[in-house]
């Protein structure tokens, strides 16, 4: 069996997320599977590294699929980019070991979150950032971020859909940056629970607005109560930035 790794970029604004939902084709996975299956002449399933939600974007999503047929990588890339909608782009196709699995073999993921932090709206970024019109205290946000780095039980930063055997995840780094009207948050870790990144960003926004004390973060982690974080950051500002294997 031949195994192929895809590197993918997409604008998630109009899609219902990565994961195919029954017969609903308006997903990233569904669109790519449809084109690959047409190319090969049989039903093909692709496995994505991250099952991004509706409205979330990707700069470097990774997926893989298997085929009985030996394929030429550059021809696959050309075919996919010719027939996929222009808000999905295949940036690389590579034949890999038959045991490579995009989801289970990933060692680290990095997400970037963009907040437009000006009083006025930014019409060009409304689908690609979250607008917070009150000035955020970035210094306090950085202090709060320090408490989230490391290995913790992140139950409080997940939602009810997160029913994993273990809720412990390790955050390798969590940066808060200011740049030309934006506050950007970059988080890297060994894995993330459902909505964990958006809840982390939501908590940092609450800290930045003075609604939550930075020093309360350790107690929130310890309590493991989901209702202690009231802000779920919008999907529009979230980007899957990088995946390491």
UniProtKB/Swiss-Prot annotation:
InterPro entries: PsdUridine_synth_cat_dom_sf, PsdUridine_synth_TruA, PsdUridine_synth_TruA_a/b_dom, PsdUridine_synth_TruA_C, TruA/RsuA/RluB/E/F_N. It comes from the Bacteria. CDD domains: PseudoU_synth_EcTruA. Substrate binds at residue 111. Keywords: Isomerase, tRNA processing. The active site is at residue 53. One of its GO terms (molecular function) is RNA binding. It catalyses: uridine(38/39/40) in tRNA = pseudouridine(38/39/40) in tRNA. Its EC number is 5.4.99.12. GO terms for biological process: tRNA pseudouridine synthesis. Signal peptide: none annotated. The keyword Plastid does not apply. It holds the Pfam family PseudoU_synth_1. Gene3D superfamilies: Pseudouridine synthase I, catalytic domain, C-terminal subdomain (3.30.70.660), Pseudouridine synthase I, catalytic domain, N-terminal subdomain (3.30.70.580). PANTHER family: PSEUDOURIDYLATE SYNTHASE (PTHR11142), TRNA PSEUDOURIDINE SYNTHASE A 2 (PTHR11142:SF22). Belongs to the tRNA pseudouridine synthase TruA family. Formation of pseudouridine at positions 38, 39 and 40 in the anticodon stem and loop of transfer RNAs. HAMAP family: TruA. Homodimer. This is tRNA pseudouridine synthase A 2. It comes from Bacillus cereus (strain ZK / E33L). The gene is truA2.
């Amino acid at each position: 069996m031949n195994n192929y790794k895809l590197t993918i970029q997409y604008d998630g604004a109009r899609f219902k997320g990565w994961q195919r939902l029954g017969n609903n084709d308006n997903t990233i996975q569904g669109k790519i599977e449809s084109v690959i299956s047409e190319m090969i002449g049989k039903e093909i399933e692709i496995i994505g590294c991250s099952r991004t939600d509706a409205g979330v974007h990707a700069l470097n999503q990774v997926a893989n699929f298997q085929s009985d047929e030996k394929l030429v990588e550059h021809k696959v890339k050309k075919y996919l980019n010719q027939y996929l909608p222009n808000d999905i782009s295949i940036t690389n196709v590579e034949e890999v070991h038959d045991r490579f699995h995009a989801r289970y073999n990933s060692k680290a993921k990095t997400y970037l979150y963009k907040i437009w932090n000006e009083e006025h709206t930014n019409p060009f970024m409304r689908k690609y950032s979250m607008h917070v019109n009150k000035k955020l205290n970035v210094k306090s946000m950085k202090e709060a971020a320090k408490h989230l780095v490391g290995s913790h039980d992140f139950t409080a930063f997940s939602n009810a859909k997160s029913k994993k055997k273990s809720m412990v995840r390790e955050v390798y780094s969590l940066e808060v940056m200011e740049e030309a009207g934006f506050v950007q948050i970059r988080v890297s870790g060994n894995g993330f629970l459902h909505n964990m990144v958006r809840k982390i960003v939501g908590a940092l926004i609450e800290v930045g607005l003075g609604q939550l004390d930075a020093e309360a973060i350790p107690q929130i982690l310890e309590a493991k109560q989901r209702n202690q974080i009231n802000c779920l950051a919008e999907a529009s500002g979230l980007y899957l930035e990088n995946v390491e294997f």
